[in-house]
Amino acid sequence: MSLVDLGKRLLEAARKGQDDEVRTLMANGAPFTTDWLGTSPLHLAAQYGHYSTAEVLLRAGVSRDARTKVDRTPLHMAAADGHVHIVELLVRSGADVNAKDMLQMTALHWATEHHHRDVVELLIKYGADVYAFSKFDKSAFDIAMEKNNTEILVMLQEAMQNQVNTNHERANPVANPVTVTAPFIFTSGEVINLASFVSSANTKATSAHLEEMEEGNSLDSSTQQVVGSGGQRVITIVTDGVPLGNIQTSLPAGGIGQPFIVTMQDGQQVLTVPAGQVAEETIIEDEEEEEEKLPLVKRPRMAEMTNRVEEMKEGSERELLQQQLQEANRRAQEYRHQLLKKEQEAEQYRLRLEAMAQQQTNGVEVDVTVVEEVAEVDAVVVTEGDEVERATQVMKSGRTTEPHTNVSIETISS
């Protein structure tokens, strides 16, 4: 059996998890080949969850960080399919936990994408970078937010608090950020209205009491609250330009029984407040959001100015089109005059040619010479009737014909 066939059989055995077949093929010299996508036997074993097969291949020396044509490693495969035991095997064998594929996604990204909580927990345990950003400028936390997976959100938030951020800038940083550094704290409760935080000094909650809070200024716009499910209290703050510096509290003596996730509608980040800790929230706003907060008086003026600019642009475009049309008409007239002039010149030249041909026909005689070829004959016998006829023809034509000197003519009378 050729090496190519041995390599193909090794790939198939790894795909099916046939440990004995894998050992036999490697003992017979089967090479560690890949298929047309660059998938190695270890990739297939990790993808299909064959723990013992992956262990055999790793002991045989297969590369633990082998790359496919899209730069995916066996760890990417195992994490995406939720094979936590193979993920642990690969990481313990020295696989790069932060390896990125062609989309700049790590194994943590893929595990979060497919809701594999155990894999996410294991990767964080082995030091996966929770601040890594993909090609689409998303971290694992952003993906968990999109998937609305609160368990993974809390897990990643705790890891972000315990891990130093070495990736300080995203791929596309937000221009002109606005930072609010005033600290604010929330405690547990079934339904929490933020307006009550600043309207009075004493606030009561349904499931846990709140300590006294300093009275702040009243909010300029309405606030909303949302209570999450699954054992987590989720508070959504709709700021609409509310100065968050007015909200100031202190932790109660009992602390917070469970983590909170506070999402800012006008911001980008999500805050989780664990028990016994004080956290600050940084809000980043875009320039478009700043424009939305302009006074209502300025908005019509800006709309009028925008309309005027658009009308001016349309008018200039129309003038340009009219100028181009006039120029095209002028050129067409020039071409038409030139064509008429050429036609007149051609007609004059034709008339001259006809006149010249007529003159040549009237003033020149055409001489036509008829050459008679007479075959060489020794003697010609002419009867009297022929001679009379010949004489008659000569009289009619008015011409005389000399007899040939070399031909003897004899007249025979009958």
From Swiss-Prot:
GO terms for biological process: positive regulation of transcription by RNA polymerase II. Its main location: nucleus. Keywords: ANK repeat, Coiled coil, Nucleus, Phosphoprotein, Repeat, Transcription, Transcription regulation. InterPro entries: Ankyrin-SOCS_Box, Ankyrin_rpt, Ankyrin_rpt-contain_sf. The modification Phosphoserine is found at residue 218. Residues 310-362 form a coiled coil. It comes from the Eukaryota. Heterotetramer of two alpha and two beta subunits. The C-terminal is necessary for the formation of a heterotetrameric GABP-alpha-2/beta-2 complex, and also facilitates homotypic dimerization. Interacts with ADGRB2. PANTHER family: ANKYRIN REPEAT PROTEIN, GA-BINDING PROTEIN SUBUNIT BETA-2. This is GA-binding protein subunit beta-2. It comes from Mus musculus (Mouse). The lineage of its organism: Eukaryota, Metazoa, Chordata, Craniata, Vertebrata.
